[in-house]
Amino acid sequence: MKVTTLTLALLFIPCFEANAQRSMNVITYNIRYNNPGDNENSWPNRREDVLKLLKVHKADIFTVQEALYDQMLNLKDGMKGFDYVGVGRDDGNVNGEFSAVFYNSNRFLLMENGTFWLSKTPKVPSKSWDAALNRICTWARLKEIETHKTFYVFNTHFDHQGVIARKKSALLILKKIGEIAQRKEPIILTGDFNLTPEEKPLMLIRQKLKDSRQVSVAAPKGPIGTFNGFDFQSKLESRIDYLFVNKYVEVDNYHVLTDSRAGRYPSDHLPVLIEVQIK
């Protein structure tokens, strides 16, 4: 009888593990565009540091802002097993900055994807209102191979000058999320919003989605601020990079990463990592 009981118990263990939820690490990172004028902080001097950070923190999905095409190729080559979706904001192909979504292709399948412009004509490269530059939002619908769960990741970079443009962009993204993600599925919205938490466009977003810092099960780790300006002595008080989620995403951990080498950060922004479970 004891042998039978033990055998049954062992048989049930694999089933329990197979059905257990798997967490995933999602990182948003403004990697700073490849600007030779940055001198010692130029991309060739920090490229390997960015790649090391993504690997050390075991990113399953990471989103980038400001990435030029050569940087996209560096990331694709350096992160083996990762694919991406995204286009350059200036021509819908390879010109201009990307707001791309990278994903581990050994863990996820790409189901759908697209890019829209934060403008009055979102289907074509364009800018509107008081925006200084073309701005985009790239999205992907992914399926986890093991669990067959599907979810959406949206990634964006709001204008750095246009006050009206930032408000209109927030409203447009919420509208587009409603149109694209009509299924009751998990949603993660990431990006550099060029907004601090108390500003109205972010308040509009928080009416529909949850700020991952505020809903993290564990206490948030790291500084409040996410912009360092390549200043290693920065007080890190300016928070402009965010990950938002809907009710189908549980945020277990939130961490603003401060990895550095020889007194230098890999970018003028700090990456933000959340550990999540898809419900």
Stretches with model-predicted labels:
Residues 2, 18-78, 89-97, 171, ...:
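N-terminal, active-site-proximal structural segment of metallo-dependent hydrolase catalytic domains
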Residues 9-18:
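Hydrophobic h-region of N-terminal signal peptides that target proteins for export
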Residues 32, 68, 157-159, 193-196:
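Catalytic metal-binding/acid-base residues of hydrolase active sites
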